Amino acid sequence: MRPGAASIRTTGSVLAFLVPSAQCMRSAPAARFSTSPIRCKKDNNSNRGVSAVRGTGLRKRQTLSVLSKKGSGDQPPKPVPITEKVTGTPDHGLWDFFKDKKLIQTPVDESRHGRAWTVGELRNQDWDALHQLWWVCVKERNRLATEKIERARLDAGYGDQENKDRDTVVQETMKAILDTLSERHQAYMEAVELAKQDPSIDLSRTDGPQFVEPAYEGVTCRVAEYTLESFGHVGVGQHLLSEGWHIVTA
């Protein structure tokens, strides 16, 4: 029988035929193999992690002192207390986007409006009145669009139909203004074509009136001078006028 490993006494000398196996029993040196880079023991950049763009702020062990130097006597500034409430400009132009300075109108207030202007009513208005009415409609549509956006942002859930009906009436008025101006432009173009055929109108003239009143030729006017006492009979004056006489009282 082969003796066990425990019964073998360790001796300082190893037999010659056991030398190769004894070398294998020893711990063979292992080569280090790693794809990871060597980790640095210390970061030489003292400002690492402090970025004004990324806003990372201070490092853990970095402190920020606002105290002045010793002996200077300067104290840190103190914030000024707010004594008045900022209200803004009461007559600012942006308030026109909100009716009565309210964020949104109630459906009852939104539905309080009249009908649209008709073309027949706008024909009697001059250019300045049509110009003012047009920009009133533009401002009203801007106000309605602002209320629509605010109503969607607040998720109010009311007033959309009233807002749409009011906007439709404003658009009908603006369309009537455009139709009125189209009629006037068409009438102007037709008048220009007629003026080109009229010999008494010179459209190329820019230094004076383009219309020259023609002189009346071939018309004779007979003048008869009478005193008021000479008209004893009314029929005499009527007869003279019918004959082409021009009566001048002296």
UniProtKB/Swiss-Prot annotation:
| InterPro entries per the UniProt record, alphabetical | MRP-L47_sf (IPR038340), Ribosomal_uL29_mit (IPR010729)
Q: Where is the protein situated, by its record's location annotation?
A: Mitochondrion
Q: Name one Pfam family in it.
A: MRP-L47
Transit pept. (range): 1-24
Report the GO molecular function annotations: structural constituent of ribosome
Q: Name one GO cellular component term.
A: mitochondrial large ribosomal subunit
Q: Which UniProt keywords apply?
A: Mitochondrion, Ribonucleoprotein, Ribosomal protein, Transit peptide
Gene Ontology BP annotations = mitochondrial translation
| Region spans: Disordered | 66-86
Assembly behavior: Component of the mitochondrial large ribosomal subunit. Mature mitochondrial ribosomes consist of a small (37S) and a large (54S) subunit. The 37S subunit contains at least 33 different proteins and 1 molecule of RNA (15S). The 54S subunit contains at least 45 different proteins and 1 molecule of RNA (21S).
Q: What does the similarity note say? A: Belongs to the universal ribosomal protein uL29 family.
Q: What is this protein called?
A: Large ribosomal subunit protein uL29m
Natural source organism:
Phaeosphaeria nodorum (strain SN15 / ATCC MYA-4574 / FGSC 10173) (Glume blotch fungus)
